């Protein structure tokens, strides 16, 4: 934890969380690891929102990031026109074990969209993409949740798939992926180079207001097959003591049609480097579609 950060807020009584959970309809009933999925607005479930904000800050500080506040919560989490929260709930242990926040472009107050605080949206993105998109962000899984943590992210992806299937007209997922501030600088350069090379932006739809430009260096990705370059990236990152960040890894496996845009340093998130992404839903691999979107 960064020494200057104040302590994270203490957990709330489980009974407060259970009371709010009991008033929600499960998006997906308890399955593997006894997890159930729920979606809610922070303004309607203040105790759950506080617990999610506490767990987010705890998770992000654990990798050198975080907001530096006692809770990772902003006005967009509590605005009735802002984000909805998706959580994985471990009923056996009465706790939240993972979460995402999401916002549907066609029905939101655009001022609540986190990506818009750091990236300018092109007129074409505003017209042709945003009304058919869901922004995703702030994903986390609780590390000390035992077996439940192993299923949390998979369960959350199933929940997101259910949301996509229910939201008529949704064609795109977008948002920001994060490289922790503690990530080795050369490993970060290689990862950003790989993303630009193999997941390039086809046009300037999302433009960072203050672009992060990594230092120049050698380009080792000269193999003809994507799979060989991917294996090389993993090898090079390991040499620097790093791995592909989990969410970047997940999106890379979700679709080869993902586009990555500018990188920027987020001063509100521990100076982590974040990259804007856009992913067409119909480009998601068949295996992932069958597993998650139904």
Where are these regions (language model features)?
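Acyl-donor binding region in acyl/amide transferases
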Residues: 67, 107-258
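Short amphipathic alpha-helix that is part of the acyltransferase structural core
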Residues: 29-98
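Short, solvent-exposed loop/turn segments at secondary-structure junctions
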Residues: 44-45, 105, 141-142, 178-182, ...
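Short beta->alpha transition motifs characteristic of CBS
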Residues: 100-106
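C-terminal/domain-terminus segments
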Residues: 259-294
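Beta-rich nucleic-acid/ligand-interaction surfaces
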Residues: 69-81, 181-182, 266-274
């Amino acid at each position: 934890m960064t020494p200057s950060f104040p302590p994270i807020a203490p957990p709330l009584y489980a009974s407060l969380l259970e009371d709010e959970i009991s008033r929600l309809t499960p998006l997906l009933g308890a399955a593997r690891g006894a997890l159930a999925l729920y979606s809610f607005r922070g303004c309607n479930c203040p105790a759950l929102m506080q617990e999610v904000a506490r767990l987010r800050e705890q998770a992000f500080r654990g990798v050198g990031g975080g907001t530096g506040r006692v809770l990772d919560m902003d006005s967009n989490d509590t605005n009735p026109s802002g984000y909805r929260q998706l959580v994985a709930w471990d009923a056996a242990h009465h706790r939240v074990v993972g979460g995402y926040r999401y916002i549907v472009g066609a029905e939101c107050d655009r001022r609540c969209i986190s990506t818009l605080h750091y990236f300018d949206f092109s007129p074409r993105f505003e017209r042709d993409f945003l009304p058919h998109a869901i922004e995703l962000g702030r994903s986390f899984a609780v590390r000390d949740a035992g077996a439940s943590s192993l299923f949390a992210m998979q369960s959350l992806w199933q929940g997101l798939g259910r949301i996509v299937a229910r939201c008529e007209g949704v064609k795109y997922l977008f948002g920001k992926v994060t490289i922790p501030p503690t990530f080795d600088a050369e490993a970060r350069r290689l990862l950003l180079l790989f993303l630009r090379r193999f997941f390039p932006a086809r046009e300037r739809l999302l433009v960072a207001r203050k672009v992060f430009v990594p230092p120049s260096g050698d380009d080792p990705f000269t193999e003809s097959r994507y799979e060989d370059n991917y294996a090389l990236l993993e090898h090079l990152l390991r040499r620097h003591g790093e791995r592909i960040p989990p969410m970047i890894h997940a999106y890379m496996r979700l679709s080869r049609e993902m586009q990555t845009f500018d990188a920027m340093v987020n001063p509100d998130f521990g100076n982590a480097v974040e990259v804007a992404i856009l992913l067409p839903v119909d480009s998601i691999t068949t295996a992932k579609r069958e597993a998650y979107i139904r």
